[in-house]
Amino acid sequence: MSTKKSPEELKRIFEKYAAKEGDPDQLSKDELKLLIQAEFPSLLKGPNTLDDLFQELDKNGDGEVSFEEFQVLVKKISQ
């Protein structure tokens, strides 16, 4: 996935994975894993593990990643 996507495209990608289980406005850890494996596979090849990445993104500690929290990941990888 190119990080040069419009906000609308990023929202659509987020919603595609968030709708797989539970709250359609939040990514569970499993949904985040599927999204990263499909859209950002290189993220899990370095020192970052899925657990570390999930903890970093889940700023409010609710066990899920909102679209706002997901945008942190997009900004991080587009730098």
From Swiss-Prot:
Has UniProt tagged this entry with the keyword Phosphoprotein?
yes
Q: Which UniProt keywords apply?
A: Acetylation, Calcium, Metal-binding, Phosphoprotein, Repeat, Vitamin D
Question: What is one cellular component GO term in this UniProt entry?
Answer: apical plasma membrane
Q: Binding residues for Ca(2+) 2, per the UniProt record? A: 58, 60, 62, 64, 69
Q: Where is the EF-hand domain?
A: 13-48, 45-79
- The UniProt annotation places Ca(2+) 1 binding at 26, 31
Asked whether the keyword Disulfide bond is assigned, the reply is no
Q: Which residues cross the membrane?
A: none
Which Gene3D superfamilies does its entry note?
Answer: EF-hand (1.10.238.10)
Residue positions, PTM N-acetylserine: 2
Q: Which residues carry this modification: Phosphoserine?
A: 42
Q: Which CDD domains match?
A: S-100 (cd00213)
Gene Ontology MF: a single term:
calcium ion binding
Concerning PANTHER family, the annotation shows:
PROTEIN S100-G, S100 CALCIUM-BINDING PROTEIN
Task: Please report the name of this protein according to its UniProt entry.
Answer: Protein S100-G
Which species is this record about? Answer: Homo sapiens
